[in-house]
């Protein structure tokens, strides 16, 4: 499906899927929250300064499907009985363009280290798979952080936008995701692409936790690139 994404086809490529077929393979983000809970959630996030609203017509759109790039949301019960909020961004992260100007790196860029002979990293791995952080991005990044579904303007009359039919929530923090979610999404995404015939199995990029930058004894230099199609924010 290279052509559908605007890339040049190669002579040895298998028959290409058209844009409609590719779009059918791309899952929609999940939205598992009731209307009443959704409103309470947005009121709370607005109160603590983690949400803003914009005109949904200005949203970036998927280059193949034309759907707006908005993350799904759902809740998950924790062992303590509390709930965690999950933002589901699976369908868009693989094709999201780098922002113009100064932008923050993707979550995968934060897990690559190369140490010299005398360098040491000391850390606790008790909860290492859930390295969690929230950063305050600039306005350019916020435009790519829509989540949930648009809401009626009368929900938040103080934030009403002239001419906008609805208000689209935007998340104001950049949140690192859980590597477990990335692994699952990567495996599922590969299976979908291979089963559909979009990519031959031997043409896939190897995936790993980061590049092996040094030469192993008796072997050539190996460079393994991360292939993240998910950064589910917790």
Regions found by a protein language model. Give the residues of each.
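Nucleic-acid-interacting cores, centered on viral/eukaryotic replication and modification enzymes
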Residues: 1-234
């Amino acid at each position: 499906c290279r052509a559908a994404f605007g890339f040049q086809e190669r002579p040895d490529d298998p028959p290409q899927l058209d844009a409609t077929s590719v779009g059918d393979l791309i899952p929609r983000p999940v939205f598992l929250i009731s209307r009443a809970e959704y409103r309470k959630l947005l009121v709370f996030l607005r109160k603590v300064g983690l949400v803003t609203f914009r005109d949904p017509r200005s949203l970036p759109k998927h280059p193949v499907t034309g759907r707006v790039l908005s993350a799904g949301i759902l809740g998950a019960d924790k062992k303590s009985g509390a709930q965690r909020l999950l933002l589901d961004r699976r369908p868009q992260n693989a094709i999201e363009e780098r922002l113009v100007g100064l932008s923050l790196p993707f979550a995968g860029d934060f897990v690559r280290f190369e140490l010299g002979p005398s360098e040491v990293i000391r850390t606790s791995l008790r909860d290492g798979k859930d390295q969690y952080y929230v950063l305050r991005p600039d306005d350019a990044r916020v435009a790519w952080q829509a989540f949930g579904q648009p809401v009626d303007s009368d929900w938040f009359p103080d934030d009403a936008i002239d001419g906008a039919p609805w208000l689209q929530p935007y998340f104001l923090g950049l949140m690192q995701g859980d590597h477990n979610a990335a692994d699952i999404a990567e495996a599922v995404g590969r299976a979908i692409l291979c089963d559909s015939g979009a990519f031959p199995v031997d043409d896939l990029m190897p995936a790993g936790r980061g590049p092996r930058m040094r030469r192993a004894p008796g072997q050539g230099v190996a460079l393994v690139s991360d292939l993240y199609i998910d950064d589910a924010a917790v």
